[in-house]
């Protein structure tokens, strides 16, 4: 017994020699979890392991994997602890700044109270007119409303500004140094002081996984944003990246360093000229003439601050450049200091006056929004730094074997090409073609942008397009969620795109491409979204779209699938100031990094408060909504059950500007034809987008207090309200039994809807068309198909069944139409993502409406289904 225990202990606890450990470690790094055969092979190859029990070798690998897992977990926790420590220190600093701000406000309030009391004591000595004026001034001084605080604070700042306004300086180094030091002082007072009243940006809460502390200005001149965060990079590298604004700010068209002057120890003064693209066709682009001052503070912090140079400050001037509007950058910049736990702590301030008077009133809120500045500039800088730091700390290979830097370059290329076409600046070679005056579609041509000077595709054939034409327009959207609209456009390209034009895009990549196609909507055999990458912050996706081309255009040219490189961002619906974009460009199958791109797409910018996001899933049957009566009747609730919906819409009304731009490569002699085709195509797209936006807007109109099922299927149309009742009545008529035992003819529509929605079997309704498509499914049906009600319309009946199921369907379909019902044996169906699901039995019946008894749709019920 004792000998047996000793033998057991000997096999359980083994002391390995250094040679044995080296051999085991070598295999571990090759294969952390070797099979039994691989372990036996190791014993044969390494004589040092010959006397080790094979079971003990298995135990060693188990222990080694466990130690590695513990090491990684310990490392992760230590890194998280360091990050939390640094974040806590940052929050304590922010708390100190807020305490100073509170003290300043208390002091100002007391000073105003003393002044008001003095005025009250002097009132009896005033004449009646003077007393009235003093009373008005007192009311202004003691009013604590938002308007009064903002206005009085603004005037107070103006008075202070007038008092401390220095005399104009010249363009000498001493004059520029004086401007730089003043800029540094004002910037630091904003970054770490109380010069600006900062409010936490809506939807941005600090935490270990947050991007940082984001704040926007309140009651100051212009628009301003402030960001504080931690980045795992050295201060010098952070400054190098942030100073290269075109690298991370996609709206930056160019930034030229006109002059550089030394300033003190390790300091520099730079004169910069910067141009920013306009985000929409409704406003001109902006430019800035700046002084930038880089220096190191006494505590070792690195600071880079900048401001506009104008007649107020003196210094050198820059002539106005047409068609740009000269904006003003108030003291801004970034403060970088080393963190105690490694990396850097960054304070970013962006403070601008974007001259909102120069744009139409409808888009003026874009230029008066501090949240927009925070999203597009301050947070963009932090996101870019976090992305680069994440890539530097680990080896990252993303989709299709590309490095993250190459994918960032592709995203930048897409955005820059879209912005360039959207702005259509003359120095880029763009000229505007005279409009026909029918609508607001603008056509511009760039004949200097020859896509084929040196470029060739994988076939070795050159790209021969001799010019590029851009059709662009902007439109106002109301009561629709920008992310939801772009998501629908992304997932349902067939609802708005023209397959013939996609084929034409492909043909422009070939030499000797022929005549223009006739524009027609649809013709797709399907699309496949191939994920390529997404940024470290999950708000942007880069993907390749594979379009199965079912077009009859130039079949000899297009005997292959079409590919689009696509970028989709702005997916967070609750973030204030978020800009949503869907930008794509045709690419060759080789997908080389230097391939020319002609980006087209959509950009939606909210211009007031976002929609209520309590019901983010739009689950109304979109197909029936699109085919229903006039949009006004749906929105106003004329067709029954819409009074509460209209009220909800009014309470959550929001507006957004959608900008659409499409580029077309063409040969010189086809310019007029391409222009006419592009104009008509743009009109078709605008019409489709308006139709989809109205449907999505209607689908959000859920009355307050409605149940979960009602929120999933809003009764905006009579069909949506009564379809579940028709399903149950038709089932009772054909099968002589109740589909749902708990409801009867006297039950309300809402109770029947809930019962059908939560039925355990998958219930699906399809249209009575030559190619039946699904129009409704309950929750179980959506789970089985792995889709949503909005996406359901793109699924045809025959694609749900496997081969045997399609044969059974073809056999039973005539019986369903003639007899009104059919029962089918168990089989297999396929979800929208290709996953197989088996079902025990399926029944089908014809659903008739409750009025005239006409056939409305066919309903299928899959019983006891499960994924294989």
From Swiss-Prot:
CDD domains according to UniProt: bZIP, homeodomain, START_ArGLABRA2_like
Organism domain of life: Eukaryota
Q: Which InterPro entries match?
A: HD (IPR001356), HD-Zip_III (IPR044830), Homeodomain-like_sf (IPR009057), MEKHLA (IPR013978), START-like_dom_sf (IPR023393), START_lipid-bd_dom (IPR002913)
Annotated localization: Nucleus
Q: Name one GO cellular component term.
A: nucleus
Q: Extract the GO molecular function terms from the UniProt entry.
A: DNA binding; DNA-binding transcription factor activity; lipid binding
Q: Where is this region: Disordered?
A: 150-171
Tissues with expression: Expressed in phloem.
Q: Which Pfam families match?
A: Homeodomain, MEKHLA, START
- What SMART domains does the annotation carry? HOX, START
Residue limits of the START domain?
Answer: 169-397
Q: What is its main location?
A: nucleus
- DNA-binding region in chain numbering: 9-72
Coiled-coil annotation reads 64-106
**What are the entry keywords?**
Coiled coil, DNA-binding, Homeobox, Nucleus, Transcription, Transcription regulation
Q: What job does the chain carry out?
A: Probable transcription factor that may be necessary for the proper patterning of vascular bundles.
Similarity comment: family membership: Belongs to the HD-ZIP homeobox family. Class III subfamily.
PANTHER family named in the record: HOMEOBOX-LEUCINE ZIPPER PROTEIN ATHB-14, HOMEOBOX-LEUCINE ZIPPER PROTEIN ATHB-15
Q: Give the protein name, as stated in the record.
A: Homeobox-leucine zipper protein HOX29
Natural source organism: Oryza sativa subsp. japonica
Question: What lineage is this protein's organism placed in?
Answer: Eukaryota, Viridiplantae, Streptophyta, Embryophyta, Tracheophyta
